[in-house]
Curated annotation (Swiss-Prot):
Residues 93-143 are annotated as: Disordered. GO terms for cellular component: chromosome; nucleus. Residues 125-143 have a biased composition (Basic residues). Residues 94-104 have a biased composition (Polar residues). It comes from the Eukaryota. Its main location: nucleus. Disruption phenotype: RNAi-mediated knockdown in late spermatogonia to early spermatocytes affects spermiogenesis and results in reduced male fertility. Sperm nuclei are long and needle-shaped due to the elongation of their chromatin region. No effect on the replacement of histones by protamines in the chromatin of sperm during the haploid phase of spermatogenesis. The gene is Prtl99C. It comes from Drosophila melanogaster. Transmembrane segments: none annotated. SUPFAM superfamilies: HMG-box. This is Protamine-like protein 99C.
Length: 201
């Protein structure tokens, strides 16, 4: 009987020749061509595996650049970098590494936690504001220039006494006189017009 052949350890083949690929309208094929140029010597299985991983992580603008045949300025990661990145574990925070993407369900849970925290903070802030006593305010606070009602009463009174003035001149003159009136005189125009008595200025 012949001797049994032992199993040989598998070694990835090294390709010494590289064909020149054409640039196509397919962005993924152009990306694969660029990946093959950068990491020449990979087996077809490894090239497809790691190139497909990085393609899924590219943004739409980066994918569009490969489709429009623009010169690539994207930093591609070698298979060794991917393996090292996947082996890293964030012990401190228990978060995923920067090379791995969160699943849609994980992103949804994280956004729900953030929204619930923000709602809790808003409710606590509102409760604190409700607990503070509000300063007592008068029902009708008047500024030192008087209220709008008082100014309108004064403007009507002034218009009746100066019918010859144009609208622009009437407003300018009335405003100037209103600002010069003492506060007690301005306060008198809070009452109806037939009660106010004003002399010609």
């Amino acid at each position: 009987m012949g001797r049994k052949r032992g199993r040989k350890e598998y070694c990835p083949p090294i390709y010494k020749r590289q064909k020149v690929a054409r640039v196509t309208n397919n962005g993924y094929l152009n990306f694969m061509t660029e990946y093959k140029k950068r990491f020449y010597g990979l087996s077809p299985q490894d090239m497809v595996h790691y190139a497909a991983k990085q393609w899924t992580q590219l943004s739409m603008a980066e994918k569009e650049a490969f489709k429009s045949k623009k010169p690539s300025t994207i930093t591609l990661k070698s298979p060794a970098q991917y393996v090292a990145c996947e082996m890293k574990s964030d012990v401190a925070g228990g978060q995923q590494s920067s090379c791995q993407r969160q699943s849609p369900s994980a992103r949804l849970r994280e956004s729900e936690r953030r929204s619930s925290r923000s709602k809790t903070l808003c409710r606590s802030a509102k409760n604190r504001q409700r607990g503070k006593p509000k300063p007592q305010q008068s029902k009708r606070r008047l500024s030192h220039m008087g209220s709008a009602v008082a100014y309108i009463h004064f403007l009507r009174k002034f218009q009746r006494k100066n019918t010859e003035l144009r609208t622009i001149d009437l407003l300018k003159t009335a405003t100037r006189l209103w600002c010069r009136l003492p506060e007690r005189h301005r306060h008198a125009f809070e009452r109806p017009l037939w009660i106010v008595t004003i002399g010609k200025s």
